Amino acid sequence: MKNLILLEGGSYRGIYTSGVLDVFMEHDIYPDCVMGVSAGALNGLGYVAQQPGRCRDVVLSYGMDPRYVGTKALRKEHNLVGFDFILRELQHVLPFDAESFYDPARKFYVGVTNCTTGEPEFISRDHCSDFLTAVAASCSMPYLCRKVKLNGEYYLDGGASSRLGLEFLDQHPEYDRVVVLLTRRMSYRKKKPSGLMR
């Protein structure tokens, strides 16, 4: 049997996911594979690197910093969200265990939306030369962030095409035990947009 954990996105609601993953790490619970969409991709970084508390510390210490989301991010990175700040600069303050993260025993994928097809795609850490850019693509919300170019294709937030990344299961039937971490209740259904938003 192979185990998989799917991590839903949800922006700041992802703090719930980071708490659940911290408890998993405290109890040495690690699956064969992790797949994260949007904020779930960010949470997956700390989980796969086996760094309890790191994702929580990033959000609680820097989540309101204008370099994280806001005017400084917009000026410096031309994005409302400062992915370079979150994924690269913060490593100097909150060290990231890259050696543990890149351990081939742990599989990690992020869900993205292909801007040409509008379909979800799943990028493997093991087959991507710039995986942190793939994580940024997974979190790049339409209209708020620029499209991210990776391997000649443009991508945006994985949640735009697949909130949970369930299509991953069709592409990877080898995972027969699946845990899905949600940031909303199972009964949640998104309301139809009104007026001009349709």
Q: Each predicted region: which residue ranges?
A:
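Patatin-like phospholipase
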Residues: 1-37, 45-198
